[in-house]
């Protein structure tokens, strides 16, 4: 576990250097707008559940999902940078902003993938080898209907005893979402052989194909 954490911690410097060599520019969360432009026919939800690499990779596979952005939620703009968020002291959670078309994929379907594939909702301030409040399980809703649906879904999972342990997922209104640095975006797709990805994220994609094959993009 310690080795895996060190592998992930090494990524910013490694990939940032690659980006610098390739384009001369590294995107900053501070330079990105906290509010996404979403078409009227679409809506968005922000989900936190451990490392945003795997979360992003899972939701990018779904029909009706038009965009997924890795980023930070739950904290302030001034500290929405990976080197600060990774300390676990800024109040942020590594998150993804999912933009989707409700006529093609329901919020309930997104919740099913979130709870049953993308992360373990019973782990408090931790997901797999990653520990700290920045890896917490949290849903940031943008509408009251999302809030009510998320609460009902958790109640149903609890009543059905889907998990052996208590679900610790928090549900909070979205105050702001800050896109992460460019080297974090689409990380799994660009680095499928990276050790952390192979160990922690590819199994999630395999589980998604096994559990929800009809929800996948062709």
For the regions a protein language model found, what residue spans apply to each?
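Flexible coil/turn and secondary-structure edge motifs
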Residues: 2-8, 12-218
């Amino acid at each position: 576990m310690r080795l895996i954490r060190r592998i992930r911690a090494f990524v910013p410097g490694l990939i940032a250097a690659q980006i610098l060599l390739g384009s001369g520019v590294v995107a900053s969360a501070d330079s990105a707008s906290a509010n996404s432009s979403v078409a009227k026919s679409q809506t968005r939800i922000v989900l936190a559940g451990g490392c945003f690499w795997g979360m992003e990779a899972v939701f990018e596979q779904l029909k009706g999902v038009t965009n997924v952005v890795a980023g930070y939620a739950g904290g302030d703009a001034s500290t929405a940078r990976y080197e600060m968020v990774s300390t676990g002291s800024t109040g942020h959670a590594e998150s993804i902003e999912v933009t989707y078309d409700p006529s093609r994929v329901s919020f309930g379907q997104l919740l099913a993938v979130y709870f049953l594939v993308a992360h373990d909702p019973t782990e408090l301030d931790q997901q797999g080898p990653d520990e700290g409040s920045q890896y917490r399980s949290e849903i940031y809703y943008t509408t009251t209907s999302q809030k009510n649906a998320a609460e009902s879904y958790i109640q149903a999972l609890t009543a059905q005893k889907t998990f052996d342990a208590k679900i610790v997922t928090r549900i909070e209104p979205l105050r702001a979402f800050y896109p992460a640095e460019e080297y974090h975006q689409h990380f799994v797709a660009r680095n499928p052989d990276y050790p952390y990805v192979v160990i922690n994220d590819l199994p999630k994609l395999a589980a998604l194909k096994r559990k929800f094959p009809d929800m996948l993009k062709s």
